[in-house]
C-alpha cells in the first residue's frame, strides 16, 4: 500500500522521471520533450521551490505518484523564470540534446494556452501523475484527498487543473473527487504529435 507524504527537494529526480514518463497524455514523453533533466529543471523544480502542498506516494521506498501544487501563480512564475534563464543558454548549446524539439514544445505552450478558471475563485492549481504500474490501487485518490485537505487548512477557496478529454482515467478520478468541468475548447497543441487536435479542459473544485 502506497504511503503519501510531503514532497522534498531530494525527490526532484524521482518526480521528474515519473512526470517525464507520463507527460504525453499519461504515456511516455521522450519523443515530445527528450530531456528528462531539462523537464525536471523547468516543470518540477519550480514547484518544489515555490509551490504548496506538494506530495508524493511511496511504495517500498519508490515514488509511484505525486501531486505538484501552487496556491498562487506569482511565486511559481518567478521560480520558473529563474530556471528558464538558467536553462536557455545550455539548451541552445546542446547540453540537453537537440534543441529543436524542446524549443518547439516550449513555444507551443506559449502559443496555445489552455482554458483557465477565474483565479479569484480558484487560485490554486495542481499536476498529478501515478506510475502506470500503480494505477487502479487508489494512489491518485489518496494523493488528491491529502492535497485538498492541505489546501483547506491553508484557507484556499478553490483549485483548478488542466487535462484533455482523451485522458479518460484521470477524468473519472477528478469527477469522483468532486471536480467539475469549468471550460473546454479544441486546441492544436498536441496536433504535431498525434496528428489531430484535442479538447482541452479546465476542471475546478470549490473548497469553501
Where are these regions (language model features)?
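Conserved GNAT-fold acetyl-CoA-binding loop/helix
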Residues: 23-42, 79-88, 97
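Conserved GNAT acetyl-CoA-binding A-motif
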Residues: 122-124, 151-163
Amino acid at each position: 500500500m502506497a504511503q503519501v507524504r510531503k514532497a522534498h527537494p531530494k525527490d526532484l529526480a524521482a518526480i521528474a522521471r515519473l512526470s517525464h514518463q507520463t507527460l504525453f497524455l499519461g504515456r511516455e514523453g521522450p519523443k515530445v520533450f527528450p530531456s528528462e533533466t531539462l523537464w525536471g529543471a523547468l516543470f518540477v523544480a519550480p514547484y518544489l521551490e515555490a509551490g504548496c502542498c506538494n506530495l508524493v506516494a511511496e511504495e517500498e521506498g519508490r515514488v509511484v505518484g505525486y501531486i505538484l501544487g501552487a496556491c498562487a501563480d506569482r511565486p511559481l512564475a518567478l521560480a520558473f523564470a529563474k530556471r528558464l534563464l538558467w536553462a536557455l543558454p545550455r539548451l541552445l548549446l546542446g547540453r540537453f540534446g537537440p534543441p529543436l524539439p524542446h524549443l518547439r514544445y516550449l513555444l507551443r505552450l506559449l502559443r496555445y494556452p489552455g482554458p483557465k478558471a477565474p483565479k479569484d475563485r480558484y487560485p490554486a492549481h495542481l499536476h498529478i501523475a501515478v506510475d502506470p504500474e500503480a494505477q487502479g490501487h487508489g494512489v491518485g485518490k489518496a494523493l488528491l484527498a491529502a492535497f485538498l485537505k492541505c489546501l483547506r487548512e491553508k484557507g484556499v477557496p478553490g483549485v483548478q487543473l488542466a487535462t484533455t478529454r482523451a485522458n479518460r482515467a484521470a477524468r473519472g478520478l477528478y469527477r469522483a473527487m468532486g471536480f467539475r468541468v469549468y471550460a473546454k475548447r479544441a486546441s492544436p497543441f498536441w496536433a504535431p504529435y498525434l496528428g489531430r487536435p484535442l479538447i482541452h479542459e479546465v476542471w475546478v473544485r470549490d473548497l469553501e
